[in-house]
């Protein structure tokens, strides 16, 4: 036998008065004994909180604020806790000996609302030796411990492998685990279930008869028959759906023609517009592409013209630049010619003035010589005149001095003084400080010798002077010629320079002789150089036109290539005409074939559309007409086979429906007559008695009773004996068994059980061997199981039957479609695809057109290449004669070399022309330059110096002589000798004075005469000099002008300049002609470009408009396509045959359909509005929206469960197949699903009987319960009178109320409610609807009235009410009822929980002092018999003899309040050891 789970202990952590306390719970009764405030209610509150941690339910009244009902107020739990983390944990061992600790963590929340936070948890697999207190606290010291928070507790168990810790976020999950482990008796899924459980605990806790429970005993004791109720609801829903479907089918049948017309016209309306927009979009797209191609072609042409314009503009710019350069060169050449002519005239002037200057130079030189000679004579005369004057002056002076000294009366002192003066003067003149009278003679001799020497030197110099006077004029003339030729030179270097000049003059004359040959050579090379530059320019132009760099050596090869290219281009141009003609003929043929196939395509497309539909319907590829005819024969054969199979399925389905109907009989009777017989005999069907047998036991009992399994159990067979006479409406074999239906068992048989069989010994000579049936039908569970199998098979057969029926109809319609196809389209359907041929032909046409365009462009390119080649050959013809010039790389160097030599020759010629005469005059007198022209002057200076030296020497000698002569004066004065000497000297002086004066007069006269002659000579020289200077200045000006002109004029210069000017004029004329031609071509090109630009603007504008139209249309078209594809209507709208109709035809087709649609949707406001919006031609998507709206409207009007498709068009096609079949099938189904009122009555009655039997069994467990004067307690279950009348009418008089149950407007529930109102008009139904009332009437619990009765004293059975019972009697009665509820819950939940688990049973009782000792003993006995645990709270004076008693005393120690607990095992036993010592102090 399975052991019942037990609560082992209750642990309180950090509660008010309990810091860490574990109460071991007794297997029966645990008593909490103590005075007021000892903690009994706190302990029970902790237990209840751990069981039901729902703050919306917890309400501990004895400690709660009076009248408090708000959820935000304290419910009595906040005050029982201490600050910090608190725990309430239950240690449980279930039937499987699994230890589980379930509990809650509680914590006060600060605030005025005094709320509490609760977190449920559970611990699994904890070893038995570990106390719950040890795991929820942590020891800090010997007397202190710390409460672990939930997070640390979780971490602590995560470290233990065998222990599992779970934390729950919802109370439902927490109770689900408790139910699965057998801790609570009922699965508490909802808040209502928790409320019932809490009300049960609350009623137990506070004792007495709870009016909250007794008023709703049906909810606590009677299980909800959800299966029956759901079956009724499903049947009603199926009937309702069936009726709605039938109504929808009828409406659909009436609207089918409207639907077909609507979808047909909507398809024509939208598809015509859809295809028109598609065609227009394609046309616009093709036009845009054509415009784009034309635009690109024009752009290419414009680019080509621009390139040509740029090239011509570049060439024109080059010609303009060249023209400017040529004009400049021409003007320069003209100016150069003018300069040459001017230079020639200047050169003539220069030559003329040069000749004049040469003549003047010769005359000037002669006159200079004359003037020089006259000036020399003049100087000599002046010198003689000065000498004469000096001599006269000196003689006069001497004579005067001597006159003064002639005084003979002078004393010797004066003479002596004169001698001394003479000596002093001699010392000064001779610069002899040591001169004396004694050595005066010696010094006189010395100075006289010097005087002689000076006189000799003077004579020698005079000789040289005479020689130099003769060569002086020739030296000056030669020196002047050297300086004029070589420039300024020193007189000392004149001879060397003159010799070098004469030596270089020969080279200059040789170079001058080479001038004319060099000039002709330079002219020739210049001409060739210009021709080379022209050839290079032509080659450069040719390379630019040719597009690549070409060497001069390759020009001949290039000419051959161009000539060959010209020949090829001539041939290709000749072939181009034939090719163009061929392409145009082919293009015309293609256009004709395209037109023919375009007419044929719509018929072929219509045939292909039907053929594709037939292919989709058949799933086969129909490739030829023979396959079509063969498939028609196959369709006929398949129709015959499918019809036979459908009839077989229909027969099997009817058989299964008969079996289901037989098994669905109330009470399990397979024959409806047995129910009537059972009611007639007052018995019960055996199948009803065993209706609750499990499916596992069903084979055994089915074999046990054998044929008697459909027997009727009656109380007394003798009472029905007479009724058997004349009984004819019954089965062939009717079995009757005597027995009490309330306590019937199988003891009437002697049975021996075998393997999968039984042997029933009916007598000594009669045995029956029955095997267990493979499909047992005994018992409701077995029948329901078989019914499920049969219903599933019936559904399968129904689906198969529907499928086959649909297939038959489908095959028939498919055969008709094939017949129509053969009659209309068989002739064109299997011909080649004209659209494929059109695509190929269009592709070929495009290729031909492209090839023709390419041919035209290639022909044009060839013409351009031909023109370029001809022009290239023309340029090469001009270049080839000049190839040698292009290849002559030394021409420039040779020209420069000859130009340098020509410059040297010109310079030599200019030198010879300028200095030829001077060189001729210099050559014979060059030798005079050997003497330095400055030596004559030096000689003159030396002569004068020698003359001065001779004069000084003479004076010195004279002074010494005077000293020597005055030597006597140093003695005594010889007056006589002095006077005689003075007279002689005076006479001599006078004679000399006369001579000197005469010489002076002659010199003066000669000087005067020569002065006048010199003046004449000077005037002639001045005249010659002024004339020479004027002509020389004019010559310098002419030479400067010649230098400024910068032209060397020669005999051929003018001819060369004129030839150069004429060449440049010819080049300028050619350049101007080419420039004018380019300007004309450029003007023509600009005109073409302007025309192209206008064309491009027009094309761009047209293309932009077309592109904007295409883009805008594309945006709308993309929206249309997306809508079409998303809604799956593309196949309906994209009708390819309409693509070949014109826009006017499609518009006419759409307008006709629009008129028909306006009439068709006139009564539908939504479709009418959508149709009106769709008429906007600028919004094509609105037509699609209208089509979708039509589709949606059809989808809503056509049942998708009837028509197995999402396409309304296909649905309309299938509708004709399905409607008749579904109508018949649904009508039959409604008859099958129709609920019989008699069946409903029987089901409700049987359910009531079953629950009454279960309540009787529960009452048997309460018969021995007694409290005080109460001897027994029982539950009384009665059927309400109004509901009993309803059942009787449903069973017996249902024919009178068929107007309700046969109405298609009322469901069975509504019909049942209407019948109930009809039978009980006095009852007020309030605001409830008939459907709600009918659903309540289908619940059997609403038919029953339950009340608790007690047998008390002499009063007998009385209704249990608190006012009629004492407190103890009320507590005992209430406890008995609660035990009954718990037991009922366990039986109800046994099928939800494992069979090997027996749940815990525990109730509470507070304030047990209200019971006497006998009542408590009875309560203990009840707990023992029902294996129930009980926790009671009693005052200190009550100590039960059995169970475990805890003495609770609240104490205060060191300002800490705690509850001292002592545990006792029975009253008479010694006080046992407490489960734990006093609470340790809080940490």
From Swiss-Prot:
Residues 666-783 are annotated as: Flexible hinge. Keywords: ATP-binding, Cell cycle, Cell division, Chromosome partition, Coiled coil, Cytoplasm, DNA condensation, DNA-binding, Nucleotide-binding. GO terms for molecular function: ATP binding; DNA binding. GO terms for cellular component: cytoplasm; nucleoid. Residues 850-870 are annotated as: Disordered. Homodimerization via its hinge domain. Binds to DNA via its C-terminal region. Interacts, and probably forms a ternary complex, with MukE and MukF via its C-terminal region. The complex formation is stimulated by calcium or magnesium. Interacts with tubulin-related protein FtsZ. This is Chromosome partition protein MukB. It comes from Erwinia tasmaniensis (strain DSM 17950 / CFBP 7177 / CIP 109463 / NCPPB 4357 / Et1/99). The lineage of its organism: Bacteria, Pseudomonadati, Pseudomonadota, Gammaproteobacteria, Enterobacterales.
